[in-house]
């Protein structure tokens, strides 16, 4: 819940969530986004969609799929590509390296065009792997913002626009400890997460973006 609400502050559409206290611990209730009044919406994982398109799993390939089959009305396909770039930067900076293609979902519209669904499974993995679960950029899956922005054009962004998107995400992520505690994460858990999210590899990337 804390990670998703932080992502929302970074300009990422997220599923509506609610923490549910249990006898031991807390569960997270997530409102389904593949439902509408009286109907079930057709949803595809990026894993299925990219395989059907003959593409390797990766953020640039997903952006290209949105360019080809995204919702045209109101330039939605462009907005989805821009948001995908923000999601990638957020995953990197929050140390969510379990961002594989089955955790990205596309909603199939009546005209068979595709819309990026709200994010629904976003949290720090705490593994300090240094690489993402999908292809990121010209350096493969390396968890660096520079790597993510190396393919800015795939998201319909200029180098300057992509940097601005990344800087906004970095400003939000920089306040993650205060936000997490405000959302009910214990001080002890926050301190443990800080060992990964605030380790030099990621902290220096945030600082570099904020100074840009």
Where are these regions (language model features)?
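Conserved kinase catalytic-core segment
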Residues: 4-10, 57-128
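Regulatory N- and C-terminal appendages and interdomain linkers associated
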Residues: 116, 134, 179-212
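Short acidic alpha-helix initiation/capping motifs at coil-to-helix transition points
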Residues: 140-146, 168-175
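Conserved ATP-binding subdomain of kinase catalytic cores across diverse folds
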Residues: 1-56, 116
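Short, surface-exposed acidic
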Residues: 75-77, 157-166, 187-193
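Small/polar glycine-rich anion-binding or flexible loop at a beta-alpha turn
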Residues: 23, 84, 164-174, 196
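Catalytic-core segments of enzymes that bind and process phosphorylated/nucleotide-bearing substrates
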Residues: 47-51, 55-65, 109-162
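C-terminal regulatory or interaction extensions
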Residues: 32, 36, 40-50, 123-129, ...
């Amino acid at each position: 819940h804390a990670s998703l609400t932080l992502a929302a502050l970074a300009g990422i559409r997220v599923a509506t969530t609610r923490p549910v206290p249990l006898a031991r611990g807390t569960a997270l209730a997530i409102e389904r986004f593949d439902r509408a009044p009286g109907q079930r919406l057709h949803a595809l994982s990026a894993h299925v969609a990219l395989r059907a398109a003959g593409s390797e799993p990766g953020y640039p390939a997903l952006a290209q799929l949105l360019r080809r089959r995204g919702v045209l009305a109101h330039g939605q396909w462009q907005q989805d590509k821009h948001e995908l770039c923000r999601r990638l930067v957020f995953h990197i900076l929050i140390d969510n390296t379990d961002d594989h293609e089955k955790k990205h979902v596309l909603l199939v519209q009546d005209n068979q065009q595709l819309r990026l669904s709200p994010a629904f499974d976003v949290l720090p993995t705490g593994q300090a792997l240094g690489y993402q679960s999908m292809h990121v950029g010209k350096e493969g899956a390396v968890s660096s913002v520079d790597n993510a922005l190396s393919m800015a054009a795939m998201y319909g962004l200029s180098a300057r626009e992509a940097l601005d998107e990344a800087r906004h995400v970095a400003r939000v992520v920089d306040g993650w400890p205060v936000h997490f505690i405000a959302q009910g994460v214990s001080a002890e858990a926050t301190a443990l997460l800080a060992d990964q999210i605030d380790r030099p590899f990621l902290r220096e990337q945030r600082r570099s973006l904020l100074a840009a």
